[in-house]
């Protein structure tokens, strides 16, 4: 009879789905399975027809029960054919035999209940089902693994507060733990999970698990009705127990008017439109200021900007035209150093006494080994603290008349006088040995050597031919050559390009004087240390005693007091006057200027000399009450 009812139910369910024209859904199949289970409960749980364990649970960790499905054999039950046996897998009881279920009734049909006497925690259990003596299913577990508490009881809620708008409210939900769980003594620790939803909704909203028996629920609408349920689990387990009964929450209406939906400000749309507007403004600004922004980010490469020059000439590589334009302008001057004659100098170093052994000055200066190239360029750049001789504003006559730059050197004065005396003697010897009266002045090619005073300058040496025909006023008398020094010293170069020569010393008595006493001057000069400001009496007496003109032997030597260490001004003045009278020979010729200035440079080896005024006479020696200084001694000594 039951089989016919089952077949009829399945036929009715299939016919209803066929007539409705819709496909079978899981809900329809579920309703059909429920109908089948109501007609025959054992058919849906175990299709194989053999008994099988469904679950084992412990509600409070003190007792547990196991359930299984009953086997069906041709639709008839076999009473007492299914049995449950268990064994505790303890080392002490491992040798024991399987024991049968202690209680088949307390937990319901097809179940076995184990009370606290048969329950042991932390000890594994193994159970098995037998049907007519044969094992059909087996399972092993421990009690703490199968804990599933009973549902909480006594659910209720309390209104906490209502929003100012009268739309939302907050409630507090409370419940009681399962009555059979010993929670207060701490035998079992439970966690609770609350779920709620609106009555018409299908999706439950879950809250986080809590250990307390109360939890607040926020933002519930006053015009809605809610369902609330709670379930629990052991803290160390993941399996929840059954849900509690559903609690319905109906919030009171606080306003007589119907609650309207909350006005939600469209922040998202405002942000989107704001970003879009800012982007548009940025693009407009960039396009409007495109050139300026380009200049700031990528500045243009500067082009050559020279006044009066076309940049196309530089691009096309026409450098000759560019140089021509630059040469025309005042601010540009081509650096043709080889043609710049006023920076050329000639130097003769006569201060080194060691060079005397190498031959005469004439041989050394006229030899080709001492000639240097005209391409050597230099310029004096000296800041020694002394008065500079390079003063373009000073006239040539001032240089000839003044002795500031070439006669005030206290250290180099004796050496310069010695060199001039040697050169004078050499000049007179050459005049006697060479036919000056027979040879025309044009055939003479003297070498003009220019020397500095104290400090070296970058100079250019070379042979310069003197064109004497351009100066007939100076060389008209051949006898005047004896009174002209062979060498000249350049002291300055005027801005016009002329060379200014320093005034030299007058010729001395004659060839006999130079031949007889060449060593006297050197002896006097070597006896004095020119670095001292004053001089010893013995040295001065020796120098004055052997002074030139030895033929005047009857003159009276100056008397010096042996007790005085220094020479007084009065004694030296007297000696200078007596020696000066002996030097003045009645047959001496009229002195002529030793040096002159260069008027024109015709060629690298030709000079045109200017006539210069006679040098001023030596300054008088001013006697004073004191000792003799270096400058005064140089005036007195020959």
UniProtKB/Swiss-Prot annotation:
Changing residue 342 to A: Impaired GHR-mediated GH internalization. The soluble form (GHBP) is produced by phorbol ester-promoted proteolytic cleavage at the cell surface (shedding) by ADAM17/TACE. Shedding is inhibited by growth hormone (GH) binding to the receptor probably due to a conformational change in GHR rendering the receptor inaccessible to ADAM17. Changing residue 349 to A: Impaired GHR-mediated GH internalization. Greatly reduced ubiquitination. Residues 294-379 are annotated as: Required for JAK2 binding. It comes from the Eukaryota. It holds the Pfam family fn3. One of its GO terms (molecular function) is proline-rich region binding. Changing residue 340 to A: Impaired GHR-mediated GH internalization. Changing residue 352 to A: No effect on GHR-mediated GH internalization. Residues 260-262 are annotated as: Required for ADAM17-mediated proteolysis. Changing residue 345 to Y: No effect on GHR-mediated GH internalization. No effect on ubiquitination. Keywords: Cell membrane, Disulfide bond, Endocytosis, Glycoprotein, Membrane, Phosphoprotein, Receptor, Secreted, Signal, Transmembrane, Transmembrane helix, Ubl conjugation. The modification Phosphotyrosine is found at residues 487, 595. Residues 19-264 are extracellular. Changing residue 342 to L: No effect on GHR-mediated GH internalization. One of its GO terms (cellular component) is endosome lumen. GO terms for biological process: endocytosis; growth hormone receptor signaling pathway via JAK-STAT. A motif (WSXWS motif) lies at residues 240-244. Receptor for pituitary gland growth hormone involved in regulating postnatal body growth. On ligand binding, couples to, and activates the JAK2/STAT5 pathway. The WSXWS motif appears to be necessary for proper protein folding and thereby efficient intracellular transport and cell-surface receptor binding. The box 1 motif is required for JAK interaction and/or activation. This is Growth hormone receptor. The gene is GHR.
């Amino acid at each position: 009879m039951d089989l016919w009812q089952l077949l009829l139910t399945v036929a009715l369910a299939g016919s209803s789905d066929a007539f409705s024209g819709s496909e079978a859904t899981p809900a329809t199949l579920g309703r059909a399975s429920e109908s089948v289970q109501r007609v025959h409960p054992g058919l849906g749980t175990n299709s194989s027809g053999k008994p099988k364990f469904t679950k084992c649970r412990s509600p409070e960790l003190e007792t547990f029960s196991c359930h299984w499905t009953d086997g069906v054999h041709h639709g008839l039950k076999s009473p007492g054919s299914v049995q449950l046996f268990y064994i505790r897998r303890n080392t002490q009881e491992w040798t024991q035999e399987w024991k049968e279920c202690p209680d088949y009734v307390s937990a319901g049909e097809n179940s076995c209940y184990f009370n606290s006497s048969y329950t042991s925690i932390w000890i594994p259990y193994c159970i098995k089902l037998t049907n007519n003596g044969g094992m059909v299913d087996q399972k092993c577990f421990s009690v703490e693994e199968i804990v599933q508490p009973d549902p909480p009881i006594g659910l209720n809620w309390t209104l906490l507060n209502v929003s100012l708008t009268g739309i939302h409210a907050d409630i507090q939900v409370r419940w009681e733990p399962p009555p059979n769980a010993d929670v207060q003594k701490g035998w079992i620790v439970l966690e609770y999970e609350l779920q709620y939803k609106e009555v018409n909704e299908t999706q439950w909203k879950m809250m986080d698990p809590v250990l307390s028996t109360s939890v607040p629920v926020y933002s519930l609408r006053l015009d809605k009705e809610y369902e609330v349920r709670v379930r629990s689990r052991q803290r160390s387990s993941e399996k929840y127990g059954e849900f509690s009964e559903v609690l319905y929450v109906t919030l009171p209406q606080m306003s007589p008017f119907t609650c309207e939906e909350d006005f939600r400000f469209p922040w998202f749309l405002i942000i989107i439109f704001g970003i879009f507007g800012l982007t548009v403004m940025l693009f407009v600004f960039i396009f409007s200021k495109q050139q300026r922004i380009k200049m700031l980010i990528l500045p243009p490469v500067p082009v050559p900007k020279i006044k009066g020059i076309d940049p196309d000439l530089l691009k096309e590589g026409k450098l000759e035209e560019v140089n021509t334009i630059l040469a025309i302008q005042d601010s540009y001057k081509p650096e043709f150093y080889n043609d710049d004659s006023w920076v050329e100098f000639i130097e003769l170093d006569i201060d080194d006494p060691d060079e005397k052994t190498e031959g005469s000055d004439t041989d050394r200066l006229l030899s080709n080994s001492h000639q240097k190239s005209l391409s050597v360029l230099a310029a004096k750049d000296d800041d020694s603290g002394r008065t500079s001789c390079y003063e373009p504003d000073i006239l040539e006559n001032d240089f000839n008349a003044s002795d500031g730059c070439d006669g005030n050197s206290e250290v180099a004065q004796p050496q310069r006088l010695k060199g001039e005396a040697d050169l004078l003697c050499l000049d007179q010897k050459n005049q006697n040995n060479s036919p000056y009266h027979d040879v025309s002045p044009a055939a003479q090619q003297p070498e003009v050597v220019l020397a500095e005073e104290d400090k070296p300058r970058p100079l250019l040496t070379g042979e310069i031919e003197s064109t004497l025909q351009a100066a007939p006023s100076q060389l008209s008398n051949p006898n005047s050559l004896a009174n002209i020094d062979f060498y000249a010293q350049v002291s300055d170069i005027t801005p016009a390009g002329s060379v200014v020569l320093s005034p030299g010393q007058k010729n001395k008595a004659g060839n006999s004087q130079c031949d007889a006493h060449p060593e006297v001057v050197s002896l006097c000069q070597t006896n004095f240390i020119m670095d001292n400001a004053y001089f010893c009496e013995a040295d001065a007496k020796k120098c004055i005693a052997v002074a030139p003109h030895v033929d005047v032997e009857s003159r009276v030597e100056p008397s010096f007091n042996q007790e005085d260490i220094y020479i007084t001004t009065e004694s030296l003045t007297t000696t200078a006057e007596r020696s000066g009278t002996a030097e003045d020979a009645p047959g001496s010729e009229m002195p002529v200027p030793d040096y002159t200035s260069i008027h024109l440079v015709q060629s690298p080896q030709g000079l045109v000399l200017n006539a210069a005024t006679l040098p001023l006479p030596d300054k008088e020696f001013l006697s004073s009450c004191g000792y003799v200084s270096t400058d005064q001694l140089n005036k007195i000594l020959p």
